[in-house]
Amino acid sequence: MRQKAIFKIAVLLAFIGLSLMVSSIQLKNVEAFSNQVIQRGASGEDVIELQSRLKYNGFYTGKVDGVFGWGTYWALRNFQEKFGLPVDGLAGAKTKQMLVKATKYDKSTANKGTTTNKGNSGGTAQENKPPQNKGTNVPNGYSQNDIQLMANAVYGESRGEPYLGQVAVAAVILNRVTSASFPNTVSGVIFEPRAFTAVADGQIYLTPNETAKKAVLDAINGWDPTGNALYYFNPDTATSKWIWTRPQIKKIGKHIFCK
């Protein structure tokens, strides 16, 4: 009886030891990145890690400079597509886990040849590494408040539309921000008098879903399915005669997009 008890304890201890070993390995893999979702506009150590792993796997051909630009964005999307992940250009938990799983590499080797110091082609990656920064993770030119406000607007204006139509609404907001005919801030565009129905009827204050947020990020990252439209309207509900005078570009879902 005593021997059985000792045997059970030994098995239990072995199981605990194995669990701790697995947890340690998983923790080591996770620690390759911080916990933040890495997206275009981010910079620092997380981006160096991301670029190095994408480069090792043959998806990224640019410099490992710690700046998440368009080259890194499209390389990441191609990696996600290849490995059956959601293709959104965001390095979240699942994407980072797959990167770690798919990569066995020496980061210092991956970084060789990517230095930019003139007259020092033999410099090491460590010598030319940008300052450590794991906190910058907002698309260029836009704050988290901008992204949240746009998600509210997209959800309030187009939550019943296909995904392409939601990206299109976000793109119109961005097109107005860069147009001389409109305010040059996200909040200025959205809260301009009589600009958006969702503001007038209060739907702007509904809590947006993840689809609306993703549509905003896709638009910020350069996807404009409207062809640079500045206006849109629903022909079934529009009461303005003026909107019908605008040159029409295309129809997406229930909305007609115009110049």
Swiss-Prot record:
UniProt entry keywords in alphabetical sequence: Cell wall biogenesis/degradation, Germination, Hydrolase, Signal, Sporulation
Bias type Low complexity, positions: 110-125
Region Disordered, residue ranges: 109-142
Record InterPro entries: Cell_wall_hydrolase_SleB (IPR011105), Peptidoglycan-bd-like (IPR002477), PGBD-like_sf (IPR036365), PGBDSf (IPR036366), SleB_dom1 (IPR042047), Spore_cortex_SleB (IPR014224)
One GO cellular component term noted in the UniProt record for this chain: intracellular immature spore
Listed GO MF terms: hydrolase activity
Stated name of the protein: Spore cortex-lytic enzyme
Species per Swiss-Prot/TrEMBL record: Bacillus cereus (strain ATCC 14579 / DSM 31 / CCUG 7414 / JCM 2152 / NBRC 15305 / NCIMB 9373 / NCTC 2599 / NRRL B-3711)
